[in-house]
Amino acid sequence: MDQFPIMGVPDGGDTAWMLVSSALVLLMTPGLAFFYGGMVRSKSVLNMIMMSISAMGVVTVLWALYGYSIAFGDDVGNIAGNPSQYWGLKGLIGVNAVAADPSTQTAAVNIPLAGTLPATVFVAFQLMFAIITVALISGAVADRLKFGAWLLFAGLWATFVYFPVAHWVFAFDGFAAEHGGWIANKLHAIDFAGGTAVHINAGVAALMLAIVLGKRRGWPATLFRPHNLPFVMLGAALLWFGWYGFNAGSATTANGVAGATFVTTTIATAAAMLGWLLTERVRDGKATTLGAASGIVAGLVAITPSCSSVNVLGALAVGVSAGVLCALAVGLKFKLGFDDSLDVVGVHLVGGLVGTLLVGLLAAPEAPAINGVAGVSKGLFYGGGFAQLERQALGACSVLVYSGIITLILALILKFTIGLRLDAEQESTGIDEAEHAESGYDFAVASGSVLPPRVTVEDSRNGIQERIGQKVEAEPK
């Protein structure tokens, strides 16, 4: 049996790529904050941003204490990793200098590794996934969830839902631990970068939390329009940029797999944006800025699990399917009566399901996740039968059911103990004022565009003199 973590010398190129990828994935959370912040009303923008940013604090602390160990420790009962194995990241941070290499007379330095990477780099990379998964949920509960309840929910959900599910999906045998999770190693469902662990997981959690919390006051009779579409588009652009670290970085090496996933991610995202806009045009007669931004995110979500298993045509199919289906799915909340404020269910749950299941149809024999890989099959459209589709469906359903049940339990516990929701007066005032005693747009009152009723030539001359430090003398009467 190998001793974990394995000690060795990391690959410099892989390490550099993964450090950049980790930073790119972290950038996605501020991008999400802008994306969500622009979609709410002006009196909720700060709270929406705060929910994303605060997830960075809560999840990071828990990840360092026990989260990484639950996600990537040795498997315990097919449920989670050993929480004590890497408690406080023990055994992962440190340098062991050994005797000089006789051939070069230079000191070789062994450090804990995850594959070819320093273990600390892999810890950081996976932390960023945990952060944004929690932050995604916040979009479903805009305008009405107490901030303190959100912080507590974020910690509990990360502990009991995300960390175990990440173990199922991302903990491959012999990488960070000897025995990893069952979806990755026994079921052999393909989820390259988190269609199940991130998007289906967060999407169904958002649905459960929104149902327990209840509808916004006045919804759906009152339409809650985005207050800042430039914020929304800026957020979508940052998400697209950061997603290259998310998908291509999941190769964990600077190689052709990273390159292939970079390309398929780009193609699918572009196709999804066009698919969403076309759907809007046919259905509503207009193609909107919000639709373009939402289509971008839908494409990124759908290609996440499939980016290493499809070719160019497959990426186009994934993107178009996600753009059209997610554009249609966001209307389900009006028919079914649940208030998913910012369409987390329609984009992330539906998009994650689309991308995960399409692997079973479109997995190409030449793709990196299929070619020469044991335990997986080509997609149905390439003559592989239903085997891979069945694996994909079982993996997706397992995450959906587990996350849905545990999230429902956590939400109900919080509702009947500390309470989840603002009161009616606070909701009417606005959650920014009620929870943070701030407003995102206070500066507008003192805008430079507010001028005196009459400005004379003398006023202008005196103003210029004051700016350059000259004494202002009164004009003789």
Curated annotation (Swiss-Prot):
This protein's record includes keyword Transcription: no
Entry keywords, A to Z: Ammonia transport, Cell membrane, Membrane, Transmembrane, Transmembrane helix, Transport
Signal peptide range: none
Record's subcellular location: Cell membrane
Record GO terms (molecular function): ammonium channel activity
Entry's Gene Ontology cellular component terms: plasma membrane
Span list, region Disordered: 457-477
Family: Belongs to the ammonia transporter channel (TC 1.A.11.2) family.
Subunit structure comment from the entry: Homotrimer.
Stated name of the protein: Ammonium transporter
UniProt source species: Mycobacterium tuberculosis (strain ATCC 25618 / H37Rv)
Taxonomic classification: Bacteria, Bacillati, Actinomycetota, Actinomycetes, Mycobacteriales
